[in-house]
Amino acid sequence: MSKTALLSLCLLVLPALAADQQWILGQSTLSYHVSHPLHQVDGVSHAARGKGICHAGQCDFLIAVPVKSFDSGDSNRDLHMLQVTRGAEFPMVTMRTRLPVSAATLPMINADLEIEFAGQTTRYRQVPFKLETQAGEIRITGIIPATLPDFKIDPPSLLTIPVKTEIPVRVDMTWRPE
């Protein structure tokens, strides 16, 4: 094979091999829900950051959000949440997942999630998420069925009555290719 043909082949093949895709988290709303017989509370954060790197047909995603970025509308309650979840010691919530590249074209996916929160790592299998594609971006919505015991957090109490252990986390994220 001549040097010119080899060079031409390299110029055509190498970019195709390096055509890995990356995704960046553009917008996010993550909200947890706490239920108590006397009231309901939602804490909301828009501070999540994330990146997805695709290679060999698989995409690895990492999302991170500061624990202190969740706002329930009551600064005293938010401070107590930071104490209960050991937010000073473990200031970030991280989530990892791996999805096939082809998942981006589906209307629904079931994702296996690994979430690290309050110093504990928990895995959730086959969590359903809805995908909507618009203008090259993908919006992902769903609910993570988290509980306080999953992360070894003792349920806080109000008037000696503990909150329910379920803390579903509503996810609404928009991803764009980088």
What is each residue range found by the language model?
Residues C10-A18:
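Hydrophobic h-region of N-terminal signal peptides that target proteins for export
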Residues A19-E178:
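Low-complexity, acidic/polar, glycine-enriched regions of mature
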Residues M1-L6:
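Bacterial N-terminal signal peptides that target proteins for export
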